[in-house]
Amino acid sequence: MSTHGDYIENVLSEEYTSIRVFKDDEGSKTELFQHNKTDNKLVKITSKNMNDHIFRILRGFRHTNLPTILDVCACEDHICVLEAYVEGETLESLLKKGILPHNVAIGYMLDICAALVFLHSQQIIHRDIKPSNVIITPEGKAVLIDFSAARLISSDKPVDTDNLGTVGYAAPEQYGVYQSLPPTDIYALGVMFNEMVAGIHPSVQTPDGKLGRIIRKCTDTQISSRYQTVGDLAHDLQKYKKYH
């Protein structure tokens, strides 16, 4: 019997051409397809470890700082997700050219904060914020991608059951100390922000003055000492931007 997964595969094979593989490792593959007639592009993600419920939540919304989810399919042994392709350059690639002016970095931070305010309102924690998961569009907008490590906040799971994330950006609680919560994403935001303005991990050095205090509050090892909401962080960033 034909399934929705079969339908997706048939459409891709008949109407699209694979033009690039972004990632292909154990249990996960991310591939770029281009429509044969319109040249429209989409990203196909298959994984044995992703939470399809998260993608089904996101499919019902559109947000300027998040990729549009086009379709989700739970197949026998994996999840298949189709996303609209986000044109642009990764923040990781951009930072290889050097640190960013403070006003530019804050602009990107506010874009990612806007994405996280929405995600957290849906009880979704991203858990893998880093420069390679941020796309800077030709218009200068920052878009947060890759939800393969995301999880839903759970009232009956006091600690994370899977240690996902990236070393250097992952908060201490992601290693089984506590459950991932909004301050978990804020920790990674702070690390990434310091890399944008100082070029190094905040454990080595942070900027002087108010900007450094903001970063240190993001990256405190104690979850209770960090900003508790992304909205609070965005408020301080906007205030800094206004007076500097």
Q: What are the roles of these predicted feature ranges?
A:
Residues 62-71:
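Conserved HxN/HPN-centered segment at the entrance to the catalytic loop
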Residues 108-109:
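Activation segment signature within eukaryotic-like protein kinase domains
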Residues 76-90:
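Conserved short submotifs of the Hanks-type protein kinase catalytic core
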Residues 19-56:
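ATP-binding glycine-rich loop module of kinase domains
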Residues 160-173:
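Conserved activation segment of eukaryotic-like protein kinases, specifically the C-terminal portion
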Residues 91-100:
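AlphaC helix of the protein kinase catalytic domain
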